[in-house]
Amino acid sequence: MRIGVLSFQGGVIEHIHHIESLKAIPVEIKNKYELNNIDGIILPGGESTTMGKLLMDTDMLEPLREKILKGLPTWGTCAGMILLANSIENSNKSYLKVIDIKVRRNAYGSQIDSFYYETLIPDISSSKIPLVFIRAPFITYLGSNVKSLCSIKGNVVAARYKNILVTSFHPELTDDLSFHKYFLSTCR
């Protein structure tokens, strides 16, 4: 199984290590041609405005959007979630628009407000999962067909719609492989 990781910035290496530890083949994605021959793609954290601009500058935005809409399993973490969202609060800019959610950027504050949390997410694991939030967004609107997987303090921080998984937090920054296992199971 070949799993693409959008490789502009963010936790690229950490996602690659988790993919390798699950015996899948990671593929760094830096242009639209590398979107071929992958079984799924991860859009990591980073800075969503920069990543969105790079998707446009490399002519990847529309080809990636088309592949996702045709069923390519896709997971967006933090900034990746923002890129996938239909809309972003207090912004007239959105990017891939493939999941019916509205997100609030930096919803938990600045870098200094980053935090760690553990919780049970039954769809993902039977054990508590460590969650790392860094300048994290959360979902402020969830479309009727989008399933909430996890909420913290009343805010949705993980959701799924068909082939698309989104998380506000960074599973790649922990040793826990639960979310990566779950995502890979959708790529088969």
Swiss-Prot record:
Q: Which reaction does it catalyse?
A: aldehydo-D-ribose 5-phosphate + D-glyceraldehyde 3-phosphate + L-glutamine = pyridoxal 5'-phosphate + L-glutamate + phosphate + 3 H2O + H(+); L-glutamine + H2O = L-glutamate + NH4(+)
The EC number on file is: 4.3.3.6, 3.5.1.2
CDD domains, from UniProt? Answer: GATase1_PB (cd01749)
The primary gene name is pdxT
The entry's function note states: Catalyzes the hydrolysis of glutamine to glutamate and ammonia as part of the biosynthesis of pyridoxal 5'-phosphate. The resulting ammonia molecule is channeled to the active site of PdxS.
Which residues constitute the catalytic centre? 78 (nucleophile), 170 (charge relay system), 172 (charge relay system)
* Highest taxon listed in the record's lineage: Bacteria
Recorded source organism is Clostridium kluyveri (strain ATCC 8527 / DSM 555 / NBRC 12016 / NCIMB 10680 / K1)
Q: In the record, what terms sit under GO molecular function?
A: glutaminase activity; pyridoxal 5'-phosphate synthase (glutamine hydrolysing) activity
Q: Which UniProt keywords apply?
A: Glutamine amidotransferase, Hydrolase, Lyase, Pyridoxal phosphate
* Residues the record lists as binding L-glutamine: 46-48, 105, 134-135
Q: Which InterPro entries match?
A: Class_I_gatase-like (IPR029062), PdxT/SNO (IPR002161), PdxT/SNO_CS (IPR021196)
According to the record's subunit comment, the protein's assembly and interactions are: In the presence of PdxS, forms a dodecamer of heterodimers. Only shows activity in the heterodimer.
Q: In which pathway does it act?
A: Cofactor biosynthesis; pyridoxal 5'-phosphate biosynthesis
One cellular component term (GO) for this entry is: cytosol
Protein's recorded name? Pyridoxal 5'-phosphate synthase subunit PdxT
Recorded hits in NCBIfam families, A to Z, give:
PLP_synth_Pdx2
Enumerate the Gene Ontology biological process terms.
glutamine catabolic process; pyridoxal phosphate biosynthetic process; pyridoxine metabolic process
Q: Which family does it belong to?
A: Belongs to the glutaminase PdxT/SNO family.
